[in-house]
Amino acid sequence: MANTPHGGVLKDLIARDAPRHDQLEAEAATLPSIVLTERQLCDLELIMNGGFSPLEGFMNQKDYDGVVAESRLADGNLFSMPITLDASKAVIEQAGLKPGSRVTLRDFRDDRNLAILTIDDIYRPDKEKEAKLVFGGDPEHPAIKYLNTKVEEYYIGGKLEAVNKLNHYDYVGLRYTPAELRIHFDKLGWTRVVAFQTRNPMHRAHRELTVRAARARQANVLIHPVVGLTKPGDIDHFTRVRAYQALLPRYPNGMAALALLPLAMRMGGPREAVWHAIIRKNHGATHFIVGRDHAGPGKNSKGQEFYGPYDAQHAVEKYRAELGIEVVEFQQVTYLPDTDEYMPKDEVPAGTKTLDISGTELRNRLRTGAHIPEWFSYPEVVKILRESSPPRALQGFTIFLTGYMNSGKDAIARALQVTLNQQGGRSVTLLLGDTVRHELSSELGFSREDRHTNVQRIAFVAGELTRAGAAVIAAPIAPYEHSRKAAREAVQSTGGSFFLVHVNTPLEYCEATDKRGIYAKARRGEIKGFTGVDDPYEAPTNANLVVDVSKQSVRSIVHEIILMLESEGYFERL
């Protein structure tokens, strides 16, 4: 028998509201609406299908305050993660929203009406408190960065009525709601289910870990990977799901099943581990594996872990009785070549030879095409990963040149384009500042905001081309550090590499060699907001390469860039 849902009742709003579908659909078309972001869509789906039971909507202030401070809803139920609907003041005022109002929630992907929210309250959260108590307070934490840069200033709380399910076009047969998964377990005759959370590909160690957990508890295994939002830079879920499917036959027949979870992770470590346990309980699992640094975001810029290695295990242990799902705490496992088996590290006899491949080492082997041994992963899994993560020589990249006008960056960009075209192996795209201004940003001016927008448009195009395997050479002035940082993050979020080249040619040289007389016009006041004259240029603090046309030839600079790319593995090595 499947586990009892958290709070006692599965809050399946889709099933509850199905008899009123036509009425709700008609009403939704008449109401003001809010278009949801990708993270909000993930949250909405799991509220509506009961994955976040006992929630029936986005948290009002009482629930939010209780969860932030004590991991408890206003009714006393344990819930460790704030689930909120953020909106800007402009959206709230434009829609005329207030307590008691009803508002339609829409899908940004296809503009469908998904739900109606009856508003309890509209409140301004204490983001600093939320960051500290929920995520630990480190401003480099991805959830805190998201909170401070993406989340709007107001939260809207209230209960939901489901209008339509979200549409998915990928792996539809693996997307079980909690109710559907419970029926699936019943059909299979499973009464004890160990759930395994992952946002990464699974290898032999993961298979051994889950089999050990199931064997010890006479249970079956639910592989329950996240396919919503994970950590930037993670392997895409399409690749991961193919790898999970390839792994399944390696389990004893009938032992394991695969189901996908449309969760937007927060990488919240201890808080997230408790949240994950609640979610798996709602999906019918009786046991849940919590490993080392569960749902942690890794290390900050100083090389420090955001959480202790076993903080998540301590958190779920603290609430073990309330969670109502048996938490399986597992140490890391390691490979013993002499006996060809995996074993938890704390059980390995002293002096025994062990082998491990870290995540960083695996990425390096995929990048370089180096051998990945079968003791680490199965050939069919490695084949899928290599298809989606080709070696660097087959990947795209972005060279982002920044500097004053007439610093020589355009000449460098053109010469580099010719050199890369001669090299062959990938298409090459040139995004010069003037060209982009004319073709993509003709309506933008030269205010700080417009300049930032222009650079982000360049970054978007560069990221998409880089994802497709092209070499992109961008050469805007890009005078602001925050714009360049955002551009780097945008390109890297697509899985591509971003190389910042600071063309550090002195302003005096740029001005003295300006044959078009642009600087002279700026000095006379005929052009306002001109970089280097009456608008600052913020020198990069993290350039991959610094060059100077007043001291170097364009040819030598291009050669430096080529050598940088070669050292990073972007050209075939004989």
Swiss-Prot record:
The record marks H203, H206 as: Transition state stabilizer. Catalyzes the first intracellular reaction of sulfate assimilation, forming adenosine-5'-phosphosulfate (APS) from inorganic sulfate and ATP. Plays an important role in sulfate activation as a component of the biosynthesis pathway of sulfur-containing amino acids. Gene3D superfamilies: HUPs (3.40.50.620), P-loop containing nucleotide triphosphate hydrolases (3.40.50.300), Sulfate adenylyltransferase (3.10.400.10). The adenylyl-sulfate kinase (APS kinase) is non-functional. It is involved in allosteric regulation by PAPS. PAPS binding induces a large rotational rearrangement of domains lowering the substrate affinity of the enzyme. Residues 170-394 are annotated as: Catalytic. The keyword Amino-acid biosynthesis applies. Sulfate binds at Q197, R199, A295. The record marks F330 as: Induces change in substrate recognition on ATP binding. Residues 395-574 are annotated as: Allosteric regulation domain. Its EC number is 2.7.7.4. This is Sulfate adenylyltransferase. One of its GO terms (biological process) is sulfate assimilation, phosphoadenylyl sulfate reduction by phosphoadenylyl-sulfate reductase (thioredoxin). SUPFAM superfamilies: Nucleotidylyl transferase, P-loop containing nucleoside triphosphate hydrolases, PUA domain-like. NCBIfam families: apsK, PRK05537.1, sopT. InterPro entries: APS_kinase, ATP-Sase_PUA-like_dom, P-loop_NTPase, PUA-like_sf, Rossmann-like_a/b/a_fold, Sulf_adenylyltr_euk, Sulf_AdTrans/APS_kinase, Sulfurylase_cat_dom. It comes from Emericella nidulans (strain FGSC A4 / ATCC 38163 / CBS 112.46 / NRRL 194 / M139). GO terms for cellular component: cytoplasm. One of its GO terms (molecular function) is sulfate adenylyltransferase (ATP) activity. Pathway: Sulfur metabolism; hydrogen sulfide biosynthesis; sulfite from sulfate: step 1/3. In the N-terminal section; belongs to the sulfate adenylyltransferase family. In the C-terminal section; belongs to the APS kinase family. It catalyses: sulfate + ATP + H(+) = adenosine 5'-phosphosulfate + diphosphate. Homohexamer. Dimer of trimers.
